[in-house]
Amino acid sequence: SSDVCSSDLIQGFTTISEGLSPEQLTQFLNMYLSAMSDIILAHGGTIDKYEGDAIIAFWNAPTYQNDHAKRAVEAALECQQKLKQMQSQLIAITRRPVKQRIGLNTGVATVGNFGSNKRFDYTMMGDAVNLASRLEGINKQFGTYTMCSEQTMKRASEAGCQLFFRNIANIVVVGRREPVR
Protein backbone atom coordinates (compact mmCIF):
# COMPACT_ATOMS: atom_id res chain seq x y z
CA SER A 1 0.00 0.00 0.00
CA SER A 2 0.98 3.61 -0.45
CA ASP A 3 0.05 6.89 1.11
CA VAL A 4 -1.27 9.56 -1.17
CA CYS A 5 -1.31 13.26 -0.36
CA SER A 6 -3.34 15.73 -2.36
CA SER A 7 -3.00 19.39 -1.44
CA ASP A 8 -4.53 22.48 -2.92
CA LEU A 9 -4.44 26.19 -2.14
CA ILE A 10 -7.83 27.61 -1.25
CA GLN A 11 -9.64 30.90 -0.82
CA GLY A 12 -9.81 31.72 -4.48
CA PHE A 13 -6.54 30.85 -6.15
CA THR A 14 -8.08 31.88 -9.46
CA THR A 15 -9.00 35.27 -7.99
CA ILE A 16 -5.54 35.61 -6.46
CA SER A 17 -3.84 34.76 -9.74
CA GLU A 18 -5.98 37.22 -11.69
CA GLY A 19 -4.80 40.03 -9.43
CA LEU A 20 -1.10 39.27 -9.81
CA SER A 21 1.36 40.06 -12.56
CA PRO A 22 2.99 37.03 -14.21
CA GLU A 23 6.15 37.74 -12.21
CA GLN A 24 4.25 37.94 -8.91
CA LEU A 25 2.33 34.75 -9.67
CA THR A 26 5.57 32.95 -10.47
CA GLN A 27 7.20 34.25 -7.28
CA PHE A 28 4.17 33.27 -5.18
CA LEU A 29 3.79 29.75 -6.60
CA ASN A 30 7.51 28.99 -6.51
CA MET A 31 7.77 30.17 -2.90
CA TYR A 32 4.78 28.06 -1.84
CA LEU A 33 5.60 24.95 -3.89
CA SER A 34 9.26 24.99 -2.83
CA ALA A 35 8.46 25.22 0.88
CA MET A 36 5.84 22.45 0.77
CA SER A 37 7.97 20.22 -1.46
CA ASP A 38 10.97 20.52 0.86
CA ILE A 39 8.83 19.25 3.74
CA ILE A 40 7.36 16.36 1.74
CA LEU A 41 10.81 15.29 0.56
CA ALA A 42 12.26 15.60 4.09
CA HIS A 43 9.60 13.12 5.24
CA GLY A 44 10.55 10.65 2.50
CA GLY A 45 7.73 11.52 0.12
CA THR A 46 7.88 11.45 -3.66
CA ILE A 47 6.51 14.46 -5.51
CA ASP A 48 4.25 13.07 -8.21
CA LYS A 49 3.26 16.31 -9.89
CA TYR A 50 2.24 19.92 -9.58
CA GLU A 51 -1.09 20.86 -11.11
CA GLY A 52 -1.28 24.63 -10.93
CA ASP A 53 -1.35 25.35 -7.21
CA ALA A 54 -1.85 21.67 -6.26
CA ILE A 55 0.78 19.18 -5.13
CA ILE A 56 0.28 15.44 -5.52
CA ALA A 57 2.74 13.30 -3.54
CA PHE A 58 3.06 9.74 -2.30
CA TRP A 59 5.03 7.60 0.11
CA ASN A 60 6.21 3.96 0.08
CA ALA A 61 7.40 4.07 -3.52
CA PRO A 62 9.83 3.77 -5.16
CA THR A 63 11.35 2.41 -1.94
CA TYR A 64 9.56 0.60 0.88
CA GLN A 65 8.77 2.57 4.06
CA ASN A 66 7.22 0.65 6.95
CA ASP A 67 6.02 3.93 8.50
CA HIS A 68 4.70 5.61 5.33
CA ALA A 69 1.36 6.67 6.83
CA LYS A 70 3.09 8.32 9.80
CA ARG A 71 5.45 10.14 7.45
CA ALA A 72 2.57 11.40 5.31
CA VAL A 73 0.53 12.65 8.28
CA GLU A 74 3.50 14.38 9.87
CA ALA A 75 4.44 15.99 6.55
CA ALA A 76 0.89 17.27 6.07
CA LEU A 77 0.82 18.89 9.50
CA GLU A 78 4.28 20.38 9.03
CA CYS A 79 3.13 21.83 5.68
CA GLN A 80 0.20 23.50 7.44
CA GLN A 81 2.54 24.91 10.11
CA LYS A 82 4.99 26.17 7.48
CA LEU A 83 2.18 27.88 5.57
CA LYS A 84 1.21 29.75 8.75
CA GLN A 85 4.84 30.84 9.22
CA MET A 86 4.97 32.08 5.61
CA GLN A 87 1.77 34.15 5.79
CA SER A 88 3.41 37.58 6.01
CA GLN A 89 5.64 36.83 2.99
CA LEU A 90 2.73 35.46 0.97
CA ILE A 91 0.32 38.25 1.94
CA ALA A 92 2.94 40.77 0.76
CA ILE A 93 2.46 39.26 -2.72
CA THR A 94 -1.23 38.22 -2.70
CA ARG A 95 -2.66 40.89 -0.38
CA ARG A 96 -4.84 38.23 1.28
CA PRO A 97 -4.35 35.25 3.62
CA VAL A 98 -3.40 31.98 1.95
CA LYS A 99 -4.66 28.61 3.18
CA GLN A 100 -4.47 25.09 1.84
CA ARG A 101 -6.51 21.90 2.03
CA ILE A 102 -4.82 18.51 2.32
CA GLY A 103 -6.32 15.06 1.83
CA LEU A 104 -4.48 11.88 2.84
CA ASN A 105 -5.36 8.29 2.08
CA THR A 106 -3.64 4.95 2.49
CA GLY A 107 -4.40 2.20 0.03
CA VAL A 108 -3.31 0.25 -2.99
CA ALA A 109 -2.06 2.34 -5.89
CA THR A 110 -0.33 1.33 -9.08
CA VAL A 111 2.96 3.20 -9.28
CA GLY A 112 5.21 3.26 -12.32
CA ASN A 113 6.01 4.79 -15.67
CA PHE A 114 2.82 5.58 -17.58
CA GLY A 115 2.51 7.16 -20.98
CA SER A 116 3.63 6.48 -24.51
CA ASN A 117 6.88 5.32 -26.03
CA LYS A 118 7.66 9.01 -26.69
CA ARG A 119 6.76 10.52 -23.30
CA PHE A 120 5.91 9.07 -19.92
CA ASP A 121 5.63 10.07 -16.28
CA TYR A 122 6.53 8.19 -13.12
CA THR A 123 3.18 8.51 -11.36
CA MET A 124 0.47 6.62 -9.51
CA MET A 125 -3.08 5.63 -10.29
CA GLY A 126 -5.96 3.93 -8.56
CA ASP A 127 -8.76 4.28 -6.07
CA ALA A 128 -6.40 5.34 -3.26
CA VAL A 129 -5.32 8.33 -5.34
CA ASN A 130 -8.89 9.32 -6.14
CA LEU A 131 -9.96 9.09 -2.49
CA ALA A 132 -7.10 11.35 -1.33
CA SER A 133 -8.26 13.95 -3.84
CA ARG A 134 -11.88 13.62 -2.69
CA LEU A 135 -10.85 14.03 0.97
CA GLU A 136 -8.93 17.18 0.08
CA GLY A 137 -12.07 18.65 -1.45
CA ILE A 138 -14.36 17.54 1.38
CA ASN A 139 -12.39 19.70 3.82
CA LYS A 140 -14.40 22.62 2.45
CA GLN A 141 -17.69 21.11 3.68
CA PHE A 142 -16.39 20.60 7.21
CA GLY A 143 -14.35 23.79 7.57
CA THR A 144 -11.19 21.73 8.03
CA TYR A 145 -7.83 21.98 6.33
CA THR A 146 -6.33 18.49 6.70
CA MET A 147 -8.34 15.29 6.39
CA CYS A 148 -7.19 11.68 6.31
CA SER A 149 -8.99 8.41 5.84
CA GLU A 150 -9.53 5.94 8.66
CA GLN A 151 -6.98 3.64 7.03
CA THR A 152 -4.33 6.37 7.17
CA MET A 153 -5.16 7.10 10.81
CA LYS A 154 -4.84 3.40 11.73
CA ARG A 155 -1.58 2.88 9.85
CA ALA A 156 -0.04 6.10 11.21
CA SER A 157 -1.01 5.16 14.79
CA GLU A 158 0.39 1.64 14.33
CA ALA A 159 3.67 3.23 13.19
CA GLY A 160 3.89 5.26 16.41
CA CYS A 161 2.29 8.53 15.36
CA GLN A 162 1.41 10.38 18.58
CA LEU A 163 -1.05 12.84 17.05
CA PHE A 164 -4.70 13.15 18.01
CA PHE A 165 -7.14 12.20 15.25
CA ARG A 166 -10.77 13.28 15.30
CA ASN A 167 -13.50 11.24 13.62
CA ILE A 168 -15.74 13.66 11.74
CA ALA A 169 -18.27 11.51 9.93
CA ASN A 170 -18.93 8.71 7.51
CA ILE A 171 -18.66 10.47 4.16
CA VAL A 172 -20.11 9.47 0.83
CA VAL A 173 -17.68 10.44 -1.90
CA VAL A 174 -18.14 10.55 -5.65
CA GLY A 175 -17.35 7.22 -7.26
CA ARG A 176 -17.94 5.07 -4.16
CA ARG A 177 -21.04 3.23 -3.04
CA GLU A 178 -20.01 2.83 0.59
CA PRO A 179 -19.22 5.77 2.89
CA VAL A 180 -15.65 6.24 4.08
CA ARG A 181 -14.36 7.32 7.46
Per-region residue spans from a language model:
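Cytosolic regulatory/linker segments at or just downstream of nucleotide-handling modules
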Residues: A109, I138-R181
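Catalytic NTP-binding/metal-coordinating core of nucleotidyl cyclase/transferase enzymes
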Residues: C5-A75
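A short glycine-enriched loop-to-beta-strand structural element that forms part of the catalytic core
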Residues: F58, R96-G112
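Amphipathic alpha-helical transducer elements in NTP-driven molecular machines
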Residues: A76, G126-A132, E150, P179
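Catalytic core regions of nucleotide second-messenger enzymes
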Residues: H43-G44, D48-E51, K82-G103, F142, ...
